[in-house]
Every structure is written in structure tokens, then in C-alpha cells.
Curated annotation (Swiss-Prot):
GO terms for molecular function: toxin activity. Disulfide bonds join C15-C62, C25-C53, C30-C61. It is found in: Secreted. GO terms for cellular component: extracellular region. It comes from the Eukaryota. Its main location: secreted. This is Venom peptide U-reduvitoxin-Pp19.
Amino acid sequence: MSPYSILFVVVIALCLLPESIVGVCWDTGCQLNAWAVRGCAQYGMRDVNMKSCSGGIIYTCCD
């Protein structure tokens, strides 16, 4: 297999893999419903998932 073929396969694989595998993602702590600022925007990231916690939400943030 030529180096260009390998590079092509790697690029295609990176395009098809979920962002949680390729990008940087992490969960916040439990952000209480009473807080004025919640979510991932305050970190310059996107909300990709939310899970309920005691009195609030845990956000999964990805860049």
C-alpha cells in the first residue's frame, strides 16, 4: 500500500469517527439549576450531551 493510500484511509477514518473519540470532550460537574450560567459555552465549547444530577445537569462539552 502506498503512503498516499494510507494517508487517504487515515483522513477518511478521522472524518467518520465520532467527535468524542477525535476531539477533546469532558463532563462538567453537576451545574445546579439555580446557577445563572450553565452549559459549555462559558468554556468556548459545545454541549453534546446532558445528564440529570441532583438539582441540576452534567454537561458533556466538546471543542
